[in-house]
Amino acid sequence: EDLAAVLGPKLDVSRGDLNRTSLSLQTIRLPSQAERLAWLAEQLATLQGHGIIYTLTVRDANQVAQWLKTQGFNVEAYTGETGDRREQLEQALLNNQVKALVATTALGMGYDKPDLAFVIHYQMPGSVVAYYQQVGRAGRALDSAYGVLLSGQEESDITDWFIRSAFPTRQEVADVLGALEDEPNGLSVP
């Protein structure tokens, strides 16, 4: 009813089961990055198929990918800084040419690999919605897939930084408003 009030009366509502019996979910608390890296190196060798390892930052995606490469895994980092290689890396995962992409949210909506066998979160995502969307990529066309959420101590610092950075400070807003009020002919951005 709330959505119909906002979007209008010609709204079709589809309801479905959110439960995915093919997807096994697990949370593992490993406070230090060293513990999580060791866990990844140990477990990645036992996981069948190919998948995505999500990180919160570009730095962590690069660090995790580099570590796994030193352990003999065929993985690649995929971030907002990947640039021209994005399509090539997406195709490599699609064609099972890499064990995993170690990715930030840059590997987001629109990427579809029905036989994705696992999604591992190196850190807790910023929201439940982000987690659900990312982990839901696994096992769409498989009888069995895994979603593993690794949780560590630096997450709150990263999340707090994202929250603090999301909005301008009071002083920044006051400065912009002051500049607009002081300019008799208004301001425009070139």
Regions found by a protein language model. Give the residues of each.
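Short acidic, hydrophobic short linear motifs in intrinsically disordered regions
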Residues: V176, E183-P190
